[in-house]
A protein has these predicted regions:
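Conserved long alpha-helical elements within nucleotide-processing catalytic cores of c-di-GMP signaling
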Residues: 1-5
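Conserved subregion of the PPM/PP2C metallophosphatase catalytic domain
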Residues: 8-190
Length: 190
């Protein structure tokens, strides 16, 4: 149901405004909050990259994207004011829900979603989107993220995105078998 609502909403938003807006996620959140059980939610990150390497995204309970700079050979720090994150869809109703007068929430209402906009990617830079399974991956007391991941990227940054992904995947498993699911998307600017 949520997937279909997203697809229909995305088509509508693209036709009406030429881009996906936070309004789509407000509507999805309201729909999911009203139609699901209290222990059900959806965490997600939605993003789009322009030809000019501007990255617009919305994060609902997902780790922030990482940008590995080919020029500086390290992860780039992103200022906190460029990093708005929100609770998962379905946990809290939106402040401006249409039927707010009849909507109850023991945990209160969430602030309006915001789209983050970054213009950080230079030639050869690598954008990583991942779930908390990668951010929390460990072997005993040793953690994979961020130092070992950054070291791996230094060694494979000259390759294409698929090779980078495969190298990270193999390195994660060599470090230790994951105890949580790990999702990873690798985007490389040419």
């Amino acid at each position: 149901m949520l997937h279909q609502a997203f697809l229909i909403g995305a088509v509508y938003e693209l036709e009406m405004s030429g881009q996906i807006t936070k309004r789509l996620f407000e509507n999805l959140n309201s729909r999911f909050y009203r139609s699901s059980g209290e222990h059900k939610f959806v965490s997600l990150i939605y993003g789009e990259i322009s030809d000019a390497a501007q990255f617009r995204f919305l994060s609902a309970a997902q780790p922030f994207p990482l940008v590995f700079s080919a020029e500086h050979d390290r992860f780039m720090e992103v200022p906190e004011e460029l990093c708005a994150s929100f609770p998962p869809l379905g946990v809290l109703p939106s402040l401006d829900v249409i039927d707010r007068a009849t909507t109850t929430s023991p945990l209160g209402f969430k602030d309006d979603y915001q789209m983050n906009e970054w213009l950080l990617m230079g030639a050869g830079d690598i954008l990583l989107l991942c779930t908390d399974g990668l951010a929390e991956h460990s072997s005993g007391d040793a953690r994979y993220f961020p130092d070992r991941l950054e070291q791996k990227l230094r060694g494979v940054k000259g390759h294409h995105a698929r090779h980078i992904f495969e190298a990270i995947e193999a390195d994660i498993r060599a470090f230790s078998e994951p105890s949580d699911d790990i999702s990873l998307v690798v985007v490389k600017r040419l």
